């Protein structure tokens, strides 16, 4: 139903019943043998690797022969993969030779580690850049580079490059689906129209999280290290298109839309009308400019002695600048395809970026102390009909920051010239904040916008705008849709807390509680998200159950958010999707009504 048409059985032959089902359903299968010597890679030296030690030839052939003979009659198998991440050498070549001889040359042999295509029939890559894909598919210069300088394929000779550019191409792994993401699927999908491009396999299908029982008797999903083991991969085992409970991630929906826009599951998921609630919110959204100023500002809101808003109507509310997000697994990625400080006009050889391992975006943000942003009051000048607040926001001991000039103006909820459906009986406050940066900000920032905080965590959200969780490189499906969800259901699925609730293109948002409703009507372009926990609380938690019960709700209104990418094990979010600190103005209306 997702439009998936092929399976790679990484990294060993599957249960036979899976192949029976694949035959029946019509799925293609890349049948992968049980060979992997990843631990011998070391510093890319492959010292004493069994793949190139003739004493291991019989074992390699035994595993290859057993896999083939067991499954040879399954119509779903389109090629035989020798194994995974085992370097290269004489034993893998012998296994490929056996398969070719056993099938009288008809069998298609795959193995990603044969970078020079000495014994396989398909050129295969893991996590290539878009430029690498384009280079492999471009046969105008048969001897041009086929890989970024740091990849082993960059060193192959001209004869190998000619073989590569005449062979079918497949990405045996791409778009590492770990945590929020992966971003960038659409660009890879566009390249798959080339006649030599056979497609690719996203890593991977399902999170490998297991149930554990907490001291209080609750059951929770767990990952590496949660069972007392000393050697583990943490939550690196949670990198599926669906979580351990088979719930698709937001990035999965974006990937399906890019690869299979007519997939049945997308039709089943199409948005339905919200009837009266939708009609009312759309009427409000269409009249954002019709809210007229009224009287004294104190008639709609309460401010402290420095001009900071404390409540609108009877609802306590605070407003702050926000530039940090709880890092995603991709924000924490350390791979060499790093686009930090890189321009879209110069991505380096075949899109390599900095080409340096080791430093993640999350580390850079935290080294810049963006998570510790502090404000300093700089004045509250009096202006007719509005409250003005001037602040400076900066990390501790930093030589950069921003000046925020807030204007708070009471407006009439009856909305002059608007239909009755758009009338609001309550207190309304127009908010305008001008953000002017100074000093040298980090090359990319997590976000820039406003964070509101209101009491209580039992809110129901209804909104007009993008209905799906989406980011600049992870587009949604319905930019002018209507959504409705409980606060707890607004965030992406997954076992480890991280950024994962942003919806761009907000036109109007209503949060309904037990006694009142908060309505937010943008007057400038912005996205939104909401959570009972702050970005720092989310960032510090290893599991959702580590978060204490909350009695407040944070609402983020973002002018910009950084892209997602797939750097947990692949390329960074590309520069064109990056968030940068620039001067910007945000405007919105806050209305509080009794229920």
Predicted regions and their residues:
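Extended substrate-binding grooves/exosites of carbohydrate-active enzymes
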Residues: 1-282
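Beta-strand/loop-rich accessory regions of lumenal/periplasmic or secreted enzymes
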Residues: 278-595
């Amino acid at each position: 139903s997702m439009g998936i048409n092929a399976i790679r059985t990484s990294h060993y032959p599957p249960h036979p019943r899976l192949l029976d089902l694949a035959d029946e359903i019509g799925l293609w299968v890349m049948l992968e043998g049980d060979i992997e010597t990843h631990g011998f890679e070391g510093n890319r030296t492959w010292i004493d690797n069994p793949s190139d030690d003739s004493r291991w030839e019989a074992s390699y052939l035994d595993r290859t022969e057993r896999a083939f003979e067991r499954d040879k009659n399954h119509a779903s198998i389109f090629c035989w993969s020798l194994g995974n991440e085992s370097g290269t050498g004489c034993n893998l070549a012998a296994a490929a030779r056996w398969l070719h001889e056993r099938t009288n040359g008809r069998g298609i042999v795959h193995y990603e580690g044969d970078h020079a295509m000495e014994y396989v029939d398909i050129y295969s890559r893991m996590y290539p850049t878009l430029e690498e894909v384009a280079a492999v598919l471009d046969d105008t210069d048969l001897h041009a580079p086929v890989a970024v300088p740091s990849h082993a394929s960059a060193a192959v000779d001209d004869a190998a490059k000619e073989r590569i550019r005449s062979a079918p191409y497949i990405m045996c792994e791409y778009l590492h689906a770990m945590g929020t993401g992966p971003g960038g699927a659409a660009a890879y999908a566009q390249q798959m129209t080339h006649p030599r491009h056979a497609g690719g396999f996203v890593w991977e299908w399902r999170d490998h999280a297991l149930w554990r029982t907490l001291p209080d008797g609750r059951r929770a999903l767990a990952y590496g290290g949660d069972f007392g083991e000393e050697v583990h991969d943490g939550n690196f085992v949670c990198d599926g298109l669906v979580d351990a409970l088979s719930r698709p991630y937001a990035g999965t929906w974006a990937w399906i839309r890019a690869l299979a826009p007519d997939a049945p599951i997308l039709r089943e998921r199409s948005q339905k009308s919200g009837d009266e609630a939708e009609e009312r919110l759309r009427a409000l959204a269409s009249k954002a400019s019709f809210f007229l100023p009224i009287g004294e500002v104190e008639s709609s809101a309460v401010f402290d002695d420095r001009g900071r808003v404390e409540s609108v109507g009877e609802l306590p509310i605070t407003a702050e600048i926000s530039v940090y997000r709880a890092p995603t697994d991709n924000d924490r990625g350390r791979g060499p395809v790093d686009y930090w400080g890189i321009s879209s006009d110069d991505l380096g050889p075949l899109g390599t970026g900095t080409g340096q391992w080791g430093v993640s975006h999350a580390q850079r943000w935290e080294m810049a102390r963006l998570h510790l942003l502090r404000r300093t009051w700089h004045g509250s000048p009096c202006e007719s009909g509005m409250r003005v607040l001037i602040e400076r926001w900066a990390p501790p001991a930093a030589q950069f920051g921003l000046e925020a000039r807030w204007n708070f103006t009471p407006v009439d909820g009856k909305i002059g010239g608007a239909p009755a459906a758009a009338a609001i009986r309550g207190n309304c406050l127009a908010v305008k904040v001008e953000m002017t940066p100074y000093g040298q900000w980090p090359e990319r920032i997590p976000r820039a916008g406003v964070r509101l905080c209101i009491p209580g965590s039992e809110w129901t959200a209804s909104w007009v705008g993008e209905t799906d969780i989406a980011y600049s490189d992870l587009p949604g499906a319905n930019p002018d849709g209507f959504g409705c969800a409980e606060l707890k259901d607004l965030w992406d699925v997954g076992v480890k807390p991280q950024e994962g609730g942003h919806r761009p293109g907000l036109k109007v948002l209503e949060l309904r509680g037990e006694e009142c409703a908060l309505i937010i009507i943008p007057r400038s372009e912005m996205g939104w998200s909401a959570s009972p926990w702050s970005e720092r609380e989310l960032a510090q938690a290893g599991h959702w159950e580590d978060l204490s019960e909350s009695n407040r709700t944070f609402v983020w209104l973002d002018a910009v958010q950084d892209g997602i990418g797939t750097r947990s094990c692949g390329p960074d979010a590309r520069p064109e999707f990056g968030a940068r600190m620039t001067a910007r103005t945000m405007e919105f209306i806050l209305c509080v009504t009794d229920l």
